[in-house]
């Protein structure tokens, strides 16, 4: 099921005699002259926002994955193309997959800015929970939210423009925004958006992938003429994402990790992968660091899904050497066992449940929310 939510500010936007445009550089994209059509109301909403005199920062979530980084980059470029003074930032360092694809495609990642002052204007991409926001977000002024998750504690009703679609990647939504607003996607922006799309859908193979993702994939791959390379690029991205060489077990646990506040509980959820022949040892290592991770991140409960990979039985697909074959869902903290077992059944051993289902974190989070709330 796919849900699309558009919340639009209705404040005499269509009867304004004067249009206020904030000056800034528009070097990144060429804007097509606005015309009547589906994007007209969208443009009117943007024109009516309280942009203020300072830079509006566009942030993905903390511990950013590729989609978080690239959706913030892509949307900041779009806003600048329309004349709004926006700049992408990251609130914590990028992961190895983002580092790889940025080097491969030759784009710069946003600068690190770990906190913002009260009143700072923000646009959020790829998250909808304060626990995942840049520090200071509660006292900031959130102008927009572009996301593909269920509504978190940053409520849609308090934000002037919200676009939330239950599809595979936030970068797909950003692609749609460019088209609706009539802004041409240059090749560098196409690479940025494709990066997030490939990562969050794993080249359209994840169960969360929707038709909209396929449409964006086809257009971006075609524009960049990557039809013969995209499978290899995706494979190399996956290898970079799962490269834990030189990392401590605690660092591995939080390499793809998100915080949530649900039902009065502070929750942390990691997302990891391991080979089937290494699963027992890997699961035990992750269990061993959970007490410290819970303490360091000030959580009440801690979970992680660990996807188990097996050799691809399709010998003719060299770009997909491994495929997922179930997942372990591990837990720690008071009440965590009851939550995990309510979703996945009895524990295999203390701290460990298992399912043959292919589930993303995005699909597991609503199940936890339902139990706790």
Q: Each predicted region: which residue ranges?
A:
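Bacterial N-terminal signal peptides that target proteins for export
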Residues: 1-10
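C-terminal motif of bacterial Sec signal peptides marking the signal peptidase cleavage site
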Residues: 20-23
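Bacterial lipoprotein signal-peptidase II cleavage site
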Residues: 25-30
